[in-house]
């Protein structure tokens, strides 16, 4: 059974060697969203509950930006890029880049020269995207993570007040609005001590045993 990235991160960080506590792992990856409530300590990692959304992830954020850029270009230039696969791929790549930049900056420039040609005249996509606009475009996606968080807490038989830590996993958790939503949902400052992308890579690379929802922190398998 594949060892999930969040559990591997806990093991790799040594969190499982401290005092017993319950933690919530909020894992927003590229294509899926997973949340787990895990009890750790005494070299043991026990999964108390899991929930999630298999149709929610960072790719959806990219798609929202892409659609906005294409719609704005169509409005100003009267050109529908959706009919041009090559142009759309360029816009998608620019959208993903913009998402990453807006995780640390309030604005970013969109610059795609020669994105289209109309009657022999080249058209360029040049505009500014703000973090505020990005959040407006994606807030409903972020709010969709609330249901699984509440479900996992309920299934574990605890409330957010019982959590000792909230751990963010997955590159999309770098989005500031995601961080704020997790803080709102749990009433706690989410931990960014672990590299979200490294957690995912680690979990994908390592296989381990999972028996009765418990993982012995010292065991490893090829």
Feature map (PLM): residue ranges:
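Oxyanion-binding/catalytic loops of NTP- or PPi-dependent enzymes
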Residues: 6-222
């Amino acid at each position: 059974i594949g060892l999930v990235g969040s559990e591997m991160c806990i093991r790799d960080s040594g969190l499982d060697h401290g005092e017993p506590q319950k933690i919530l792992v909020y894992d927003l990856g590229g294509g899926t969203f997973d949340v787990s409530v895990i009890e750790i300590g005494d070299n043991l990692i026990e999964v108390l509950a899991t929930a999630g959304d298999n149709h929610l992830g960072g790719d959806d954020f990219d798609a929202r930006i892409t659609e906005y850029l294409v719609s704005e270009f169509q409005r100003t230039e009267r050109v529908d890029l959706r009919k041009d696969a090559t142009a759309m791929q360029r816009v998608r790549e620019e959208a993903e880049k913009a998402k990453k930049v807006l995780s640390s900056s309030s604005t970013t420039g969109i610059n795609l020269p020669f994105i289209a040609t109309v009657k022999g005249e080249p058209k360029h996509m040049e505009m500014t995207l703000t973090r505020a606009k990005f959040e407006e475009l994606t807030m409903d996606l972020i709010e969709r993570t609330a249901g699984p968080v509440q479900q996992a807490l309920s299934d574990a038989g605890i409330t957010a007040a019982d959590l000792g830590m909230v751990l963010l996993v997955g590159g999309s958790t770098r989005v500031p609005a995601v961080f704020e939503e997790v803080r709102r949902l749990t009433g706690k400052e989410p931990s960014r001590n672990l590299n979200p992308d490294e957690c995912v890579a680690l979990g994908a690379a390592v296989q381990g045993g999972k028996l009765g929802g418990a993982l012995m922190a010292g065991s490893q398998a090829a």
